[in-house]
């Protein structure tokens, strides 16, 4: 029987108390993450927003009438996406943001688990109305998609808690290291760019390591087969808080935005942005990020197609 790729609350409870899941000192400026997975199964809702609803183009056809179909990660990537106690309900900050957007637009939410490789084609082909996948706004992506921002994109370098590595903040710090990174991601571009600089300086090469299974990534770090993980800070901080087996040693060099992604020119990005701003103003947005330990990645206003990486 094929096992679910998700970490469920039942699995987590074997490691930690179900009432107080995490209260661990993280690496950045005394940040403390306190995440109660049991309580976080209860949805955070908001009301309809007339302005956002009025901005939906009259000609727009949703994938399923009356529903907002949003692609989210099919792999376990807490706090962004994981399964609840019933082993089927998607929870996490991405699902919570999706629900706030759907509520604001007066629609029922339909979440569709998908792979990172699938969302671009799915959006282009009209399989999904939008994707919430920790997608960073870049100049290249804006040529094909529209974006409504909902979070600051912070990247982090994480190592085994007993690693001798103390700092990764510049290209020479990754010289000769094996680093787990996602294919086709912003962090991969940064890592490969640093490697090119190191090659030009005659420094040892970095070896990117690509894994699609979270358990394999964790095992690779703990066994010493790889030196570091470079990816979304929210995911790295969650793992560090959950097990205490990893720690952050640096952040990525660029600050960008994570955004709800829609088909280019279909007119849906603006009403989504308005719905997010409605949630920001009434406090439901802050509730979502706070309860998933992402409070240091809040935005004060959602915007459509902001300057991105490469602009």
Stretches with model-predicted labels:
Residues 27-53, 95-104, 163-165, 169-172, ...:
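Extended ligand-binding regions for polar small-molecule ligands
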Residues 32-134, 291:
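Extracytoplasmic small-molecule ligand-binding "clamshell" domains
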Residues 59-61, 93, 141-153, 247-250, ...:
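A structural signal for short loop-to-beta-strand junctions that line the ligand-binding cleft
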Residues 74-78, 88-103, 135, 154-213, ...:
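Bilobed "Venus flytrap"/periplasmic-binding protein-like clamshell domains
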Residues 99, 108-173:
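Acidic, polar ligand-binding/catalytic clefts
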Residues 110-121, 166, 206-219, 254-256:
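Short helix-initiation/N-cap motifs at beta->coil->alpha
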Residues 117-118, 135-142, 191-199, 220-254:
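A ligand-binding cleft/hinge motif common to bilobed small-molecule-binding domains
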Residues 152-159, 237, 241-277, 295-311:
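Periplasmic-binding protein-like
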């Amino acid at each position: 029987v094929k096992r679910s790729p998700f970490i469920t609350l039942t699995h987590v409870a074997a490691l930690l108390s179900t009432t107080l899941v995490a209260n661990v000192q993280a690496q950045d400026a005394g940040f403390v993450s306190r995440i109660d997975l049991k309580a976080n199964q209860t949805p955070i809702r908001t009301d309809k927003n007339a302005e956002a609803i009025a901005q939906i183009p009259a000609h727009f056809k949703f994938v399923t009438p009356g529903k907002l179909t949003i692609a989210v990660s099919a792999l376990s990537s807490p706090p962004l996406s994981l399964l609840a106690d019933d082993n089927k309900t998607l929870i996490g900050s991405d699902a919570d943001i999706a629900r706030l957007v759907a509520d604001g637009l007066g629609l029922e939410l339909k979440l569709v688990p998908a792979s990172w490789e699938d969302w671009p084609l799915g959006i282009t082909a009209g399989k999904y109305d939008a994707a919430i996948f920790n997608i960073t706004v870049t100049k290249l992506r804006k040529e094909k998609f529209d974006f409504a921002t909902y979070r600051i994109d912070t990247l982090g370098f994480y190592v085994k808690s007993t690693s001798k590595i103390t700092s990764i903040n510049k290209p020479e710090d990754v010289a000769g290291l094996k680093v787990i990174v996602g294919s086709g991601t912003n962090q991969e571009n940064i890592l490969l760019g640093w490697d090119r600089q190191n090659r030009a300086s005659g420094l040892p090469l970095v070896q990117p390591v690509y894994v699609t299974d979270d358990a394999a990534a964790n095992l690779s770090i703990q066994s010493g087969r790889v030196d570091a993980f470079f990816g979304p800070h929210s995911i790295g901080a969650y793992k560090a808080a959950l097990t205490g087996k990893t720690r952050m040693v640096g952040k990525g060099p660029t600050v960008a935005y994570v955004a709800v992604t829609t088909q280019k020119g279909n007119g849906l990005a603006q009403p989504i942005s308005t719905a997010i701003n409605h949630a920001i103003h009434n406090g439901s947005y802050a509730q979502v990020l706070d309860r998933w330990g992402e409070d240091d990645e809040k935005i004060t206003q959602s915007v459509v197609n902001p300057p991105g990486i490469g602009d």
